[in-house]
Amino acid sequence: MNIELALTLVSLVLVVSAGPLVVVLLSARGGNL
C-alpha cells in the first residue's frame, strides 16, 4: 500500500467526518446565540 494512497484515504475520511461536525457546531452556535 502506497503512503500517498493511505494519506489520500485518511484525508478523505477526515473531510467526510469533519463536514457534518462543522455543520453541527455552526448550527449549535447559531442556535445558542
Swiss-Prot record:
The chain crosses the membrane at residues 5-25. GO terms for biological process: photosynthesis. It is found in: Plastid, Chloroplast thylakoid membrane. InterPro entries: PSII_Ycf12_core-subunit (IPR010284). The keyword Plastid applies. It is a single-pass membrane protein. The keyword Transmembrane helix applies. Its main location: plastid. Coiled coil: none annotated. Disruption phenotype: About 15% decrease in O(2) evolution, no visible change in PSII protein profile under moderate light (50 umol photons/m(2)/s), increased sensitivity to photoinhibition under high light (1000 umol photons/m(2)/s). Keywords: Chloroplast, Membrane, Photosynthesis, Photosystem II, Plastid, Thylakoid, Transmembrane, Transmembrane helix. It holds the Pfam family PSII_Ycf12. GO terms for cellular component: chloroplast thylakoid membrane; photosystem II. PSII is composed of 1 copy each of membrane proteins PsbA, PsbB, PsbC, PsbD, PsbE, PsbF, PsbH, PsbI, PsbJ, PsbK, PsbL, PsbM, PsbT, PsbX, PsbY, PsbZ, Psb30/Ycf12, peripheral proteins of the oxygen-evolving complex and a large number of cofactors. It forms dimeric complexes. A core subunit of photosystem II (PSII), required for optimal photosynthesis, probably helps stabilize the reaction center. NCBIfam families: PRK13686.1. Belongs to the Psb30/Ycf12 family. This is Photosystem II reaction center protein Psb30. It comes from Chlamydomonas reinhardtii (Chlamydomonas smithii). The lineage of its organism: Eukaryota, Viridiplantae, Chlorophyta, core chlorophytes, Chlorophyceae. The gene is psb30.
